[in-house]
Amino acid sequence: MLSFDINRSWYDGLYQDEGSVVSAARSFVMLHEEKSEKAVLLIHGYAGYPGELVRPANDLYDAGFDVYVPRLPGMGTTGKDFVNSSSHDWLTVCSNALKELLLSYDSVDIVAHSMGTLIGIILASSFSVNHLVLAAPAFKMPALKPALNKFLSLFKKDISIAWQSDPRYHLHYEGAPADDAILGKEYWSHIYPSALKELIKLQKSALKLFPHLSADTLLIAASNDQITDPLMVEKIALEKKKGITKCIYIKDATHYLFYDISPKAEDEAVKAVLEFLS
């Protein structure tokens, strides 16, 4: 059963958004009437929103999982909220959610996308999760130059860039792509150096922790990913020595592989997640 009634205590003590949350960005849960013994925590990426994860959430629910998809503070509202939130807020809301799930379920898995994979790694290094899925992991982002971003952040709070909606992507949230315009206006038509600094913090921590993870881990690289570097995925996967580590490369997939241009690539990504968690 789908519900947008998520535990608000996960956000206690964190940045409180001033802007309204768009419909697509609402946190949601999918819970069985008879409580499942297994749960999965889905974590979206940088300037992302829960609606991007509707497809894997639906399939995981149908496979018997209770599904939890929290919205990260500062995202899905306004650019002002984004720059006022921090990596601490993003990480802590997921940590709070995971702690609760570990107390309530026999097994808990994490499925994360893009920057969410960095949060997933950090959580898996501190908590006992059953499986960890890292889709289009943000190990390296060719356009992100930490030194240059640090310099720009001294002088620029907001750099405008060109953006337009791409109807080729198959978004699965109700009413899609109704919220693309407002999210594009607030997030995707801007570079916020201060927010990127927060992403870099997570990236540094996750890369340091990844080789020491013991959780069974699936890494999914997308051949046409123009945001993160798919060639780095297998290289970094080899650094992990404990537990099962599986790396797959999906042809024709883009960075947004859970609502992709290619239905075949999207299906392959979701199938890989389900098979790994089964």
Cite the ranges covered by each PLM segment.
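Active-site nucleophile loop of the alpha/beta-hydrolase fold
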Residues: V133-L144
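Short beta-strand/loop motif that positions the catalytic acidic residue
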Residues: L213, L219-A221, D225
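Active-site nucleophile elbow and catalytic-triad environment of alpha/beta-hydrolase enzymes
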Residues: A25, Y192-F210
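Catalytic histidine neighborhood in serine/cysteine hydrolases
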Residues: E234, L238-Y256
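Gly/Ala-rich beta-loop-alpha elbow adjacent to hydrolase catalytic centers
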Residues: A112-G116, G120
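Catalytic histidine-centered segment of alpha/beta-hydrolase-like enzymes
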Residues: A253-E266
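Short alpha-helix in the alpha/beta-hydrolase fold that links the catalytic acid
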Residues: P56, A215, D229-L238
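Conserved alpha/beta-hydrolase
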Residues: L60-G79
